[in-house]
């Protein structure tokens, strides 16, 4: 893994994502970390008064931009001091909205991984508010860092799987080569509240071993009707450091409604979620 992109908004949420990335970089072959700040001022903000009936002038907007540039430069220098000389830290400001800014940097810089923080209960950050849209629209892998998450070396990871999408387990092939830090024991968790797996365990196990033969892995089952609760309960009881979400409409992540994903991310206060692409 050569390059990590982290969108920032100077909140506690993004600060924790940066700290996690810093600690992660000690276990990974990271060469560059890019900090991205969106400074988008809509036409309406430029022509309409604020709630205090103040009209923003071009000078006001430029002053705010300079302040943000100063904050971002300081944040970049602080990160560089923590990472040392082996990792290049780059800062960039975009005049585009967050989603478009992220997409443009991905197109220009080709990062291997996008790291974003999810908000703690009671906190609302600009990045955290858009985390679902960011995760779904990103063309590169996304690592979501809960507000209370502290980096631990990834030794065990759970991969929730609906066997309608069993072929997507093949995306795990080679992941341990492209991400030097990611070579855990895999727990493939078949989320099956309707108990369709009963009597077909051997068939499913053979399919898993064929598709995920580059990892030490084992197949487990969850019959909890609350899919998210079943996954998090399993992870909490098995010393897991990471949840890996497969892409596609049968993924546990993408198959949830917007509100369900929000609830899941809020409930999951500890474990990072890696969303494959």
Language model features: what each stretch is:
Residues 1-56, 156-221, 240, 268:
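Small/aliphatic-rich secondary-structure junction motif
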Residues 1-16, 112-171, 267-277:
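Intrinsically disordered or low-complexity boundary/linker segments at protein termini
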Residues 26, 107-108, 136, 180, ...:
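Solvent-exposed polar/charged
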Residues 37, 118, 190, 246-248, ...:
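Short secondary-structure boundary segments
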Residues 40, 77-114, 213-243, 247-261, ...:
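Structural beta-alpha unit
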Residues 55-70:
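A short acidic, glycine-rich active-site loop
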Residues 128-130, 173, 202-205, 257-262:
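Charged helix-capping and loop-helix junction motifs
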């Amino acid at each position: 893994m050569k390059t990590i992109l982290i969108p920032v908004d100077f909140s506690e949420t993004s600060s924790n994502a940066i700290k996690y990335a810093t600690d992660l970089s000690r276990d990974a072959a990271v060469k560059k970390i890019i900090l991205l700040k969106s400074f988008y001022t809509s036409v309406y903000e430029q022509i309409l008064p604020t709630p205090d009936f103040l009209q923003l002038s071009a000078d006001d907007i430029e002053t705010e931009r300079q302040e943000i540039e100063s904050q971002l430069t300081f944040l970049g220098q602080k990160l560089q001091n923590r990472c040392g000389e082996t990792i290049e830290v780059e800062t960039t400001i975009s005049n585009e909205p967050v989603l478009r800014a992220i997409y443009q940097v991905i197109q220009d810089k080709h990062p291997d991984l996008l790291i974003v923080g999810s908000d703690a209960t009671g906190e609302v950050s600009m990045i955290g508010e858009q985390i679902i849209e960011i995760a779904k629209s990103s063309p590169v892998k996304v690592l979501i860092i809960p507000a209370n998450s502290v980096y631990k070396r990834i030794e065990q990871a759970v991969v929730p799987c609906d066997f309608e999408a069993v072929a997507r387990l093949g995306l795990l092939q080679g992941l341990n080569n492209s991400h030097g830090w990611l070579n855990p024991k895999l727990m493939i968790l078949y989320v099956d509240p309707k108990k369709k797996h009963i009597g077909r365990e051997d068939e499913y196990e053979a399919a898993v071993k064929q598709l995920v033969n580059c990892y030490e892995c084992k197949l487990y089952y969850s019959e909890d009707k609350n899919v998210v609760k079943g996954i998090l309960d399993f992870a909490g009881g098995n010393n897991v450091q990471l949840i890996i979400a497969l892409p596609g409409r049968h993924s546990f992540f993408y198959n949830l409604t917007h509100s369900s994903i929000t609830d899941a991310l809020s409930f999951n206060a500890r474990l990072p979620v890696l969303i494959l692409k």
